[in-house]
Amino acid sequence: MRKFIAIALVFTMALGLTACAGGGSDIHRLNMATGGDAGTYYAFGGVIASVLTNKIENVEVTAQTSGGSIDNARKLKNKEAEIAFMQNDVLQYAVTGTESMKDDGAMENLCAIASLYPEAVQLVATKSSGIKTIADLKGKKVCVGDQGSGSEVNASQIIAAAGMSYSDFDVQYLSFSEASTAMQNGTVDAAFATSALPNSAITELANYTDIVVVPIDGDIADNLIAQYPFYAKTTIGTDVYGVEAAETVAMMAVLTTTADLDEEVVYNITKTLFENQTDLIAGNAHGREVTLDTALQGVTVDFHPGAVKYYKEKGIM
């Protein structure tokens, strides 16, 4: 009987040692909050999650659907996710407890890992309207987005930076899909939309109506960025909608976490993100935009110490 107990104890200890030795350390299982299942955040988030899981030892990342940036901030705060996609203006509002996040209180524990790609503010007009500049909006019918939406906030800030106000034109509060229909029907001359490129509704509009992309550049862009530093300059290329290229401004999609996440884990996430671009591109076209040249762009909150460590190694901090 004693011999049986001794053998059982040895067997149990062996199992325990095997379990501990399996990967050399604990597995870090991380939930990544993204966006709706039809959106860019979820699609690209799934690619990033796969690359991080395959390339980093003892890290497993799972992309989860969510309601987008505001929801993701709350998920990080409530520890329902460890990393998340967020638009950089919402990240700023979340950390400071202002604007769209004022009812949630300041989430000072949130911090950035990296800027990923721009979400461009797109001002599109029908060619027949004759609109070529923001000043040309005066007296026209202009859709600024749903009232209180991100696009509408961006539109109001840009109009103010141009020294204008909504009283200068006939303002319409419509989603861009609704605005697209109205532009085809000739009841709206121009519309604002903030999204990743290309915007499917604009692509569809361009199939039915001759359009122009109106530049948001020069002093207007400079004034805007001086007041709202989470904006960044970008270009809508000719290849996007098949029309003349235009300079504009953009929010940045930012990979975000909290200060609680292990520094070495975040270091490895950051390193892997920027040193496996081929894998990112293979999974999603936005992988081309994940570069060290724009890693810090548009971020107005603190970066996680693990990300800072990597950026200092690469000489960009």
What is each of the regions a protein language model found here?
Residues 1-30:
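Short, low-complexity disordered leader/linker segments with a strong preference
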Residues 27, 56-58, 68, 78, ...:
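Extracytoplasmic
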Residues 81-117, 199:
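Acidic, polar ligand-binding/catalytic clefts
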Residues 88-90, 98-101, 129, 166-255:
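Pocket-lining segment of extracytoplasmic ligand-binding domains
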Residues 174, 178-180, 184-185, 195-215, ...:
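An extracytoplasmic/periplasmic, membrane-proximal ligand-sensing/linker region
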